[in-house]
Amino acid sequence: MTDQGEPEVVGPNEGATIEGPVGGPLTFKARGEQTNGTFTALENVIPPGQGPPLHLHANDDEAWYLFEGELRFKLDGELRAAPRGSFVFVPRGTPHCFQNVAEKPARILVMFTPAGMERFFDQFASLSTPDPAAFAKIGKPLGMNVLGPPLAQSDPR
């Protein structure tokens, strides 16, 4: 392996899959160990109506590409629609959350840079009964601060 990591192709239905924090499967496509710590990439399926609480990442930039479905984002206080095919970028320190507003699951590619957020997802998936308080407790040591409730509660449609 070089200092930069090794070239790799991760095909459809490949990668370690765990239960995501808002329900639905989360599949790692690239972890920090594979990318020399430069980024984490994962595919996530978001059930209808679901999404994380309002939060920010002090240490990570985050980006999404929406393969299927429709999400609604709250980005630094502004509500924005993200239909299928949308790309969303959120710089570190920006308050954000999202919600699947479609009647079917949404499928997204999520990237964090630098790598490290995979630790949050691994720890959350290991809980026997995940709850909203665990989201904040696990995220805080990783620089993720929960600021408010999910969009379904703060800004219902």
List the model feature ranges, each with a label:
Residues T35, R72, R92-E118:
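Ligand-binding loop in jelly-roll beta-barrel domains
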Residues V10-G11, E70, G77-P95:
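Short acidic-glycine-tyrosine-enriched beta hairpin
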Residues V22, K74-D76:
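Short strand-coil-strand connectors
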Residues A30-R31, P53-A58, Q99-V101:
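Short histidine-centered beta-strand/loop micro-motifs
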